[in-house]
Amino acid sequence: MHTKTIKELSALLQTKKISATELAQLFLKRMGASDLNAFLHVDEALTLQQAAAADQRIASGNAGVLTGIPIAHKDIFVTRNWRSTAGSKMLENYVSPFDATVVENFNQAGMVTLGKLNCDEFAMGSSNENSYFGAVKNPWDKTAIPGGSSGGSAAAIAARLTPASTATDTGGSIRQPAALCGVTGIKPTYGRVSRFGMIAFASSLDQGGPIAKTAEDCGLLLNAMVSFDERDSTSVERDKEDFTRDLNAPLEGLKIGIPREYFGAGLSADVEQAVRAALGEYEKLGATLVDISLPKTELSIPTYYVIAPAEASSNLSRFDGVRYGFRAKDYTDLSDMYCKTRAEGFGEEVKRRILVGAYVLSHGYYDAYYLQAQKIRRLIAQDFQQAFTLCDVIMGPVAPSVAWDLGDKADDPVANYLADIFTLSTSLAGLPGMSIPCGFGQGEKNAKRPVGLQIIGNYFAEAKLLNVAHQYQQATDWHLRQPAE
């Protein structure tokens, strides 16, 4: 039962072959037996209460596709009934007075919350080793990182601990862990998914999205996740659409752009081989490969690491120990309380980014760094628009290598940052991008570590991306493979 897709589980629920309560119990049991550290907060009584309500809804005949389907939320989305910690000591015991819009949308659809998922602290990281609550292990190889910052979200799907999870992507935090855990994830166009109740890291980049087993499942989840929200000033108002509408469209005549900058010196040979094999599969499906250039790709890392920390230093100034969250025990006056609270409450990586952000926003440096970065960001977006005159979608690797060993890059933040080279530019441009599994690494160690293929589309082209991904998943079985129990 735990290996079935959302679509399959939905059919079983609607025909009453299984109840939402039985399904929830099954996944709660699997979660309890797992040693991946993917889940942070679980409340079985609350989960079973939601499941019973879903069963009633199904019995009364007003259930939707997602009614009764279990889901787990990245601990960046605030929840009224579960703790919302953002993976930080700063919010260790925080319980929100309201639900994030994304959580609200899924509750209204009748989904059953299994709990909150581990992530890098305040979503800052590429390996899920920056969580105050400990690292998450990759289910394919427990000595490897799962990717980040949504490591718990991807690991829980790969280990079949939940059929659906929410995640957030600021510079690659949906796509990179999805790739390294061999599952499917999509970051929608910026503004598609409400950020209300999503603990902010970098407000002009943060975007929520789903991680699941298949592209079809991601489409079903997006149907509920995407909504206009007046409480989020960056929310985009568009007509409601069915993201699964084009899944079965043939790919004959599709033009796939292959950026030459994504296949350079930094890309490991086994990742390149898996990605090129996937591109060959697309040619068999009737697509044409087109050589394109995204010349500002290498500038995406310095640009991102000016803009994101600048916004983070501003966003995280609200955590001062006064109204909520952690407060230092011993202090002499207000100023001392602020200093000690933030010194003790934030982890090393978060403090590093706050310092960088404060520096680039400071007098005398703002023009030299922040303003320049915003100009380059615009040029990166223009590169993509130029490319889309030649092709329909863009494809390449998600990450330059398969997952590395836990602790391997712990002392080298820059090496961690470089893992996002292929995902950052999409985020800076605000474009939709997704990751689908397309193979494994090579050699004794890497042969069990997955590789992801990245598919990037133009603004609001999520249905197109899901179609392109779904057609590949109809022709291959990478998405069906699962780690040994």
From Swiss-Prot:
Q: Which InterPro entries does the record match to this protein?
A: Amidase, Amidase_CS, Amidase_dom, AS_sf, GatA
Specify the superkingdom. Bacteria
* PROSITE patterns found in the cross-reference section: AMIDASES
Role description: Allows the formation of correctly charged Gln-tRNA(Gln) through the transamidation of misacylated Glu-tRNA(Gln) in organisms which lack glutaminyl-tRNA synthetase. The reaction takes place in the presence of glutamine and ATP through an activated gamma-phospho-Glu-tRNA(Gln).
User: Which Pfam family would be a valid example here?
Assistant: Amidase
Catalyzed reactions? L-glutamyl-tRNA(Gln) + L-glutamine + ATP + H2O = L-glutaminyl-tRNA(Gln) + L-glutamate + ADP + phosphate + H(+)
Q: What is its EC number?
A: 6.3.5.7
Which terms in the GO cellular component ontology are assigned?
glutamyl-tRNA(Gln) amidotransferase complex
Record protein name field: Glutamyl-tRNA(Gln) amidotransferase subunit A
User: Which GO terms of the molecular function aspect are on file?
Assistant: ATP binding; glutaminyl-tRNA synthase (glutamine-hydrolyzing) activity
* First-tier enzyme category under EC: ligase
Catalytic residue positions: K74, S149, S173
Query: Member of which family?
Result: Belongs to the amidase family. GatA subfamily.
**Keywords, in A-Z order:** ATP-binding, Ligase, Nucleotide-binding, Protein biosynthesis
Q: Write the lineage as a comma-separated list.
A: Bacteria, Pseudomonadati, Pseudomonadota, Betaproteobacteria, Burkholderiales
